[in-house]
């Protein structure tokens, strides 16, 4: 094959899924000449699985990407066909927005954003090789011989690396939705010394809306109130489409059990580990054999298609078995299957080989983001993508990397878990993974991150000005509520009684004091006579949360200060752990392999005990005093 020089860029992004789109846009918006390469121009921002964005923890990630200046939130708002705020009966830490998206319109909108982004080129090509010279990345080589030179390369290849599609006893090379896999790039990474693993994921069948009897299902409408993921979206209303709820039956389970001998998960055809929190229907039936039924949601894939997504029935069973079990569900007795479900096995990069910036430790200038790092989900991919794009841009500008820690963002939790812990299954973000989740709420992502996005050049001056106005309104209103005292007259008594808030104050009380009562919301304060400013709902929500949960927030902030002290104790990257006496054998091996950046990160490595951390602290302090190189 004859090679030719096809172009020179600051940053080349390989892959245009949810990670690749964010990485490319971030690098270009930070002033880098950027190239995004995709296997198929018609599959930019493809949603090969669930046509949905958000949910617990995942919605938090979307809000954080948006606050930094990313695109997934805005694009979801454009393409949404239904939105719901989940967990409203619980505390604000776990409130989460979830949207159904028109998957085709989502792709078209995101593709247009990339095409219109100054400094970004979008091209179709199959990348076969990462070019490395003198230990540093120098660009990529495509299957047609095109050589694109670059100062940094971001790999966002999703599940395409040596992808293998499995349906029953049928198995063939392929990517999601019948696309081509990437084979030689996986071999190239292995040749470069990058350790790879192998995971599995899957998707359910798509069925024809015209063959469904919805009268036998429960309707799941969107919220009447209009929600948006992006803090700068101006969409005031949208026409929504409902989802539908049905259940598996004993007959469903019987068909599955009688065909386990044809299930690749149980015949040994699939050997790799799948996602724990999104198991196949055959796994659910086997694992929870005492459960008579499982929820199944029927979700529209878009406004201009009859395809419906069967959420909760991911499977790799043969096609005939899939159709038979689908027809045992209420409402699906005569259903027609438009696409079968399938499993896909793929190579991934063991993420402990990455720095917190998502740059590979072995090859400077090479970054990885998304499912190639062993994660699952569009949101996790987008979060890694924007961070990899930011850090690739900073790398070519010889600037310090941009790192978010666990106390600052769910993004920080996600990346720290990936680069610190040895994951053995596709990683999914959960609210339970965040120690400081009361501080990392979806409602305050802009207050946490927009200023950071502005400083690195991702957030526009116009957006930053809007953020500052909101921040000022929140501070002013909070001060007003703290300072405004009201007498406990008939009006206040009437409001408290109507809200079933017991125990009347014996004397005057501030509006903030009233708001701290569990039964009292901001809407109750508006019923008390006085001058109430006309404020946006998002400002009122923020003020109410800050006041009502003030004690808990302060307690968590104190915990964060302890965390930060450990994070600030840096460990030199060239430290010789062989010289650190007193470490256990396992701890020394793990520390040598992962090479944590701080004492805090070291303490989170499996196999590193508190005693090992103490030994390391003593060693570093002694080295500092003696003025050794490890200082």
Curated annotation (Swiss-Prot):
<keyword id="KW-0963">Cytoplasm</keyword>
<dbReference type="Pfam" id="PF21680">
    <property type="entry name" value="GIDA_C_1st"/>
</dbReference>
<feature type="binding site">
    <location>
        <position position="371"/>
    </location>
    <ligand>
        <name>FAD</name>
    </ligand>
</feature>
<keyword id="KW-0274">FAD</keyword>
<dbReference type="InterPro" id="IPR040131">
    <property type="entry name" value="MnmG_N"/>
</dbReference>
<keyword id="KW-0819">tRNA processing</keyword>
<dbReference type="InterPro" id="IPR026904">
    <property type="entry name" value="MnmG_C"/>
</dbReference>
<feature type="binding site">
    <location>
        <begin position="274"/>
        <end position="288"/>
    </location>
    <ligand>
        <name>NAD(+)</name>
    </ligand>
</feature>
<dbReference type="Pfam" id="PF13932">
    <property type="entry name" value="SAM_GIDA_C"/>
</dbReference>
<dbReference type="InterPro" id="IPR020595">
    <property type="entry name" value="MnmG-rel_CS"/>
</dbReference>
<feature type="binding site">
    <location>
        <position position="182"/>
    </location>
    <ligand>
        <name>FAD</name>
    </ligand>
</feature>
<dbReference type="Pfam" id="PF01134">
    <property type="entry name" value="GIDA"/>
</dbReference>
<keyword id="KW-0285">Flavoprotein</keyword>
<dbReference type="GO" id="GO:0005829">
    <property type="term" value="C:cytosol"/>
</dbReference>
<dbReference type="GO" id="GO:0002098">
    <property type="term" value="P:tRNA wobble uridine modification"/>
</dbReference>
<comment type="subunit">
    <text>Homodimer. Heterotetramer of two MnmE and two MnmG subunits.</text>
</comment>
<comment type="function">
    <text>NAD-binding protein involved in the addition of a carboxymethylaminomethyl (cmnm) group at the wobble position (U34) of certain tRNAs, forming tRNA-cmnm(5)s(2)U34.</text>
</comment>
<protein>
    <recommendedName>
        <fullName>tRNA uridine 5-carboxymethylaminomethyl modification enzyme MnmG</fullName>
    </recommendedName>
</protein>
<feature type="binding site">
    <location>
        <position position="127"/>
    </location>
    <ligand>
        <name>FAD</name>
    </ligand>
</feature>
<dbReference type="InterPro" id="IPR036188">
    <property type="entry name" value="FAD/NAD-bd_sf"/>
</dbReference>
<feature type="binding site">
    <location>
        <begin position="15"/>
        <end position="20"/>
    </location>
    <ligand>
        <name>FAD</name>
    </ligand>
</feature>
<dbReference type="InterPro" id="IPR004416">
    <property type="entry name" value="MnmG"/>
</dbReference>
<keyword id="KW-0520">NAD</keyword>
<dbReference type="GO" id="GO:0030488">
    <property type="term" value="P:tRNA methylation"/>
</dbReference>
<dbReference type="InterPro" id="IPR044920">
    <property type="entry name" value="MnmG_C_subdom_sf"/>
</dbReference>
<dbReference type="InterPro" id="IPR049312">
    <property type="entry name" value="GIDA_C_N"/>
</dbReference>
<dbReference type="InterPro" id="IPR047001">
    <property type="entry name" value="MnmG_C_subdom"/>
</dbReference>
<dbReference type="InterPro" id="IPR002218">
    <property type="entry name" value="MnmG-rel"/>
</dbReference>
<dbReference type="GO" id="GO:0050660">
    <property type="term" value="F:flavin adenine dinucleotide binding"/>
</dbReference>
<comment type="similarity">
    <text>Belongs to the MnmG family.</text>
</comment>
